[in-house]
Amino acid sequence: MGDEYLAEPEDEVAISMWPENIGDKHQKQFKMEKLGKDQDALEDANFQQKPSSVDLNRLMELANSEKGVSQMQYFVKHWEYKRANTARLLKEQIGLLCQQRKEIEQRKQQILEEQQFQDESYYAVKRQVPILDEVYKDEWKRPSKKNDDLSHNQELKIDAEYDSISYWKERAMQLEKTLEASLQRERSLEEKLEENIKNLQSHTPVEEFSGMLKRADYFLHLVLQSAPIVIAHQDADLRYRFIFNHFPTLADEDVIGKTDYEILSGEGIEEMNNVKKEVMASGKATKREFVFNTPLFGAKTFVTYIEPVFSKSGETIGVNYVAMDITDQVTRREKMADIRVREAVQKAKETELSKSLHITEETMRAKQMLATMSHEIRSPLSGVLSMAEILATTKLDKEQYQLLEVMLSSGDLVLQLINDILDLSKVESGAMKLEATTFRPREVVKHVLQTAAASLKKELILEGCIGDNVPLEVTGDVLRIRQILTNLISNAVKFTHEGKVGINLHVLDKQLPGCRIEGGQLHSKAHSAPAAAAEHFSASPRKCDNDTLGCSNHEDACQTGIPSNDNFGEHHEGDEVVWLRCDVYDTGIGIPEKSLPLLFKRYMQASDDHARKYGGTGLGLAICKQLVELMGGTLTVVSKENEGSTFSFVLPCKIPVKEDHSDDPDDMPSSGGDFTTSDIEGSFIFKPQARPYLLTSGVSVMNNTKLIGGNQFYDPPNILEDRKPFSNGFVLAEDHSTNSASTAHQSNGPSVSRTNKEQHDNAMVIELNRQAERVSSSRGDTTSVSGLIHEERGPCRVHEEKSLHKKSKCSPSSNKAKILLVEDNKVNIMVAKSMLEQLGHGIDIVNNGLEAIRAIQKRQYDIILMDVHMPEMDGLQATKFIRSFENTGCWDTSVKPEHDQIIAGSDNLSDCAHMKKQGKRVPIIAMTANSFSESAEECLAAGMDSYISKPVNFQNIKECLQQYLPPQ
């Protein structure tokens, strides 16, 4: 063994291949000894020694099985291998220690020999003994020890006088200590080896296996002790062989060996057993949710995972299942779903509300635009027509009368065109409102034909036929129905040169196909076959096998509901609804087949030749169609060129609860005259040889009655009660057969005087128009009426107006009334002033509402004519101030705060004492060019008594003064 290996052997100790904690590692790796209390965490755990539901017989059966025996043999072989390996390692360590001991002894012997040699030469000559270079080098190269105080960079210097014997003695003592420590470690290892051998001999594989199973069982109980699950095993008969975490009310003997039916009862048990049988039959695992409601644990929801158990031969011998209570999760899930539904509904409502708000805003803007356009256009037109009417009261020659008649007629046409455009715009923007009133269909048809016959100059026969099944009274928008009929009759007269024009009204035996009454609301579907529908409902007096055009290219208005006012279109359960069909037929020029698709489009006519020859804007039929659809009906046409046309519309109408047949004017007998009637058969005819006059002022206003292509004669039921029925059964005119000559002569010029009979007839017509205008003005819509049939009017209108003016002007001066006119437009001031002065009344003029209040404070007036739109203060605000003063006796400044100082400054005026009379109320009449019914409602709400629509005329002003001025 060389010097390099023996260098400093006393400081070198061979490193053992066994760690110091060999016992602990061995115990942790092989678990061959019982762990101490401080090492086994499960030893200190306090398990509840509850009766386990483990089948011990089953466990022993598994241990004695072939697989269990093979596992036991494996554990025995593993234990023997570990024991042999441990003995081998110990022997190797002991051999290494013995070798190190021998080397140390040899080194010690060498040191002793060297020391003896030095002792023998001690008494020789003393000299410095240098250390050999080899020894110096060896000492320098020797690795530093743990307790060595010399640094590697320090030079080794030994004095020659150094005592070598002491040095080597110290070295020997150090080696002795190292050897003793090594021997002590060897003895400790031997003791541990003997102890491990004893421990290995005291343990058997069965005990170790049992301990492992016990620890696993304790761990399983610890994990599943508080888990919300049920684990169970059932055999092929679905009897429990094992269950864990069952309900505490049941003992082991109440569960083991029994089925679900024997343990539980209630909802969900049968369903779960059927699923278990399906799993056993199919051999596939499944996962389901079961809802139980049993007396044992109440209503619960479990999510269950069921898997089959197979034998070695592959047969299904049972099922294992794991069930977890998810009742709280299901409840939260249902709540979340309900919250999501409510959020979706709320979001949908917000979206719908936003859409409705947007639509409402658009509608309001459209209505505002229409109101502005109506006001801005009708105001200057009012000045033109009113001035022309005033001019008609002056002295004119024949040519001037004719020119003035043309001027009035043209103004009427312009005003009618404006009304048509406004009607169409209101329908399309949703601003058109319908009003449900009770009316008599027979009278409507009768007066429409009567109005058309009044100005008819063609050799045509106007006839009407009312079915026996038509009710005496129905509920609907009579003004819109009259507007549709008048327009269709006007077109029929315009395009018919000879023959007849008529109206056929009857009730359908069944309702319109595609329409139904559900929930009190009218619904319909678009018609897929309009031609078939038209042929099915064709009831024209003549055979109409012609081309048919319906409303198929437009969605039926009643599908989305009918815009309503006063519950129009709302049919309550129990209300009887009838479907009225009206056919307007003629024997005129007809309509070419190629023009039928364009018939109901705006600004479209059958051909350019028709437009040049007959005139018109092409809006009449479009408005009729939209009005019919707005009321929930349909409009169709059957026509053939050169053979005539038949326009038919069907409308739903309600029958009033009470009907009184005793005072029906249609049931009165008639005889003689210029027409014949048969009330029993419901038919009447207007013959062409005599046509009664109907006075139609070009600037007269028929409120809420906008007709296309002709005038209208409004005859509300309350007027019918006041009028005297004539001998011919009608209420418009008496027998005019004797007056036809004078009527024809009168049309030649205004200078020819008329007979007393004609004057009486015209006076009757004027009175009827006055009452009609008064009733219809309460509805708010205003329309200028041009003439009964535009191309058929005569020049007698100027003369009649002049005659009416002369009668009005002859009033005595004692009837002079004090009138305040509040108007900012100079033209309107001139018109009203001229008319009022010619009627013999005094007038004061102011330009805005503030000036009107100051004028009222200084003077008492019999009536106030007030414009609505004015600067500084409009008519509505001024009316509120006036009504507030009349009620309280003082000027209330709370109506308009910005005018507090202006109004308050005049409270002390002594001139306003006349206004403080108790109960004194000055009539205030609005003068507006707005054609919307909302304008009338605003006026009445502000405190006004009535209103006059512009353009104004003598008739309107006279009626107003007669109604509201106190009798003189």
Curated annotation (Swiss-Prot):
Compositionally biased region (Polar residues): 738-754
EC number: 2.7.13.3
UniProt-listed InterPro entries: CheY-like_superfamily, HATPase_C_sf, His_kinase_dom, HisK_dim/P_dom, HisK_dim/P_sf, PAS-like_dom_sf, Sig_transdc_His_kin-like_C, Sig_transdc_resp-reg_receiver
Entry keywords, A to Z: Coiled coil, Cytokinin signaling pathway, Kinase, Phosphoprotein, Transferase, Two-component regulatory system
This protein's record includes keyword Transcription regulation: no
Enzyme class: transferase
Gene3D superfamilies: 1.10.287.130, 3.40.50.2300, Histidine kinase-like ATPase, C-terminal domain, PAS domain
Gene Ontology molecular-function annotations: histidine phosphotransfer kinase activity; phosphorelay sensor kinase activity
Reaction catalysed by this enzyme: ATP + protein L-histidine = ADP + protein N-phospho-L-histidine
GO terms of biological process kind: cytokinin-activated signaling pathway
UniProt domain Histidine kinase: residue ranges: 372-655
Pfam families, alphabetized: HATPase_c, HisKA, Response_reg
Response regulatory domain sequence ranges: 818-965
Domain notes: Histidine-containing phosphotransfer domain (HPt) contains an active histidine that mediates the phosphotransfer.
Function: Cytokinin receptor related to bacterial two-component regulators. Functions as a histidine kinase and transmits the stress signal to a downstream MAPK cascade.
Protein name in UniProt: Probable histidine kinase 1
